[in-house]
Amino acid sequence: MARKHPKRSDPRILVLDIGGTHVKLLVTGLKQAIKIPSGPALTPKAMVQQVNQALTDRPYVVVSIGYPGPVVHGHPVREPFNLGSGWVGFNFRKAFSRPVKIVNDAAMQALGGYERGKLLFLGLGTGLGSAMIVDGILEPMELAHLPYKNGKTYEDYIGLRGLERLGRRKWEREVGKVVAQLRAALEPEQVVLGGGNAKKLKKLPPGTMRGNNQNAFKGGFRLWSEDKRESQRFRY
């Protein structure tokens, strides 16, 4: 089982899970995550300011960020669809005055819930996050904006826009169809459905399990693990 919190020897870690409606943050030792609003006007500079205001009495020494978009070599390479601009090229290390590790948000959730084998993670939130871990190698994916049907993307059907347009029942059927399609193509041993809208599924598609949203924080802690056995399990 993955441990819930870093060991005492680990640094005090701040984990940020950036979503389309909220940024959720947790510092080593805190039992409850803090939420700050996000949305189309949120810039990285504003986020850093709000995070530090929320943590005036909670010191931290390193930062993990789950970013809602593609990340290459620890840097965002595309502006997020559901937030403000300025994320690509932003110097997070300088802004926080601390070491920072950035991964895709779905990848961070997948990392937090992974045990072994081949896992596919789909994050059903404002958008659609996706990641795979194959024998400890983390592979973020960008399935959201691939064509699905009727001139629309996967995200148009099973992201928040799809839920609002189709209604819960039809949306749930589309989730099942997408999962079946991806299972056939990628042959994962496990399929985990996470994100804020996963809880709206009345019946899970066959062969899937509902993820725990706390896995994002576990994944963020794992990025800085000082346990060599833990840190050597993953490549990202």
Language model features: what each stretch is:
Residues 2-49, 53, 57, 137-165:
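Short glycine-rich, Thr/Ser-proximal phosphate-binding strand/loop in the N-terminal lobe
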Residues 13-17, 62-64, 119-123, 192:
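Short glycine-aspartate micro-motif
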Residues 22, 182-213:
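Glycine-rich phosphate-binding loops at beta-strand->alpha-helix junctions
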Residues 23, 90, 94-109, 118, ...:
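Glycine-rich phosphate-binding loop plus the immediately following alpha-helix
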Residues 23-27, 69, 111, 128-133:
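Short beta-strand scaffold segments in enzyme catalytic cores
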Residues 39-52, 56-64, 69-118, 157-158, ...:
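Glycine-rich phosphate-binding loop and adjoining helix at the ATP-binding site
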Residues 67, 124-126, 195-196:
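Short secondary-structure boundary segments
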Residues 143-180, 187, 209-219, 224-232, ...:
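Helical "lid/coupling" subdomains associated with nucleotide-phosphate turnover
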